[in-house]
């Protein structure tokens, strides 16, 4: 459970852990062409839309306060890198908007993508599908947004529509620069996979995931 930009009024500290760094085992091809296994340190950081303070004022006012997405990322991502994160994935409940930046803006991810050190973004809130080459929504035609490849200012980004209709998948292609693993953006893929086939039948559920969510589905 991570949330970087919501703070406790009482303590002045983030309400939850702002980020977490996990070790992921990968299989790669070594310089000699042979398969090797390696560990990649992946940092995960998340953000809520600061406008929760207006939407849920009756419950939140006097208890918590928010910081802007951009300045929060600028604070914690260097710290994550200093603690060994080779990759940083930002999970942000917001969409894209190129209005002048404000710490209270609802959809601040266009600016989040410009913070150095963000390797991938999982975004949402505006209930749209990204990447989507056919989309005509203005925010997917902003400068630096590649709606076909799923890039926002060069950062691989996915928005998986709404109500579980799609599964957002970012396939980060990694290479080792001699010191650590880095993202090869030219070979990275982004897609939002629909849960329905062309004939309107549904894809088969993943057994492991189905087991994890069975109780919630039955509720």
Question: What are the residue ranges of the model-derived segments?
Answer:
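Acidic, metal/ion-coordinating pockets
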Residues: 1-194
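Non-catalytic terminal accessory segments
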Residues: 81-83, 180-182, 190-219
């Amino acid at each position: 459970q991570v949330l970087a930009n919501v703070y406790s009024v009482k303590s002045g500290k983030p309400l939850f852990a702002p980020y977490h760094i996990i070790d992921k085992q990968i299989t790669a091809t070594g310089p000699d062409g042979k398969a090797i296994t390696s560990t990649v340190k992946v940092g995960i950081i998340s953000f809520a839309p600061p406008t929760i303070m207006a939407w849920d004022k009756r419950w939140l006012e006097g208890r918590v306060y928010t910081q802007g997405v951009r300045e929060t990322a600028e604070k914690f991502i260097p710290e994550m890198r200093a603690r060994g994160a080779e990759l940083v994935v930002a999970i942000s409940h917001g969409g894209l908007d190129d209005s002048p930046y404000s710490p209270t803006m609802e959809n601040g991810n266009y600016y989040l993508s410009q913070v150095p050190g963000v390797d991938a973004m999982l975004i949402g809130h505006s209930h749209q599908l990204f990447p989507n080459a056919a989309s005509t929504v203005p925010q997917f035609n902003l400068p630096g947004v590649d709606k076909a490849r799923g890039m926002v200012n060069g950062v691989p980004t996915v928005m998986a529509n709404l109500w579980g209709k799609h599964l957002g998948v970012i396939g980060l292609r990694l290479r080792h620069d001699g010191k650590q693993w880095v993202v090869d953006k030219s070979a990275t893929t982004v897609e939002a996979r629909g849960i329905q086939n062309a004939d309107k039948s549904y894809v088969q559920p993943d057994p492991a995931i189905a087991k994890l969510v069975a109780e919630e589905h039955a509720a």
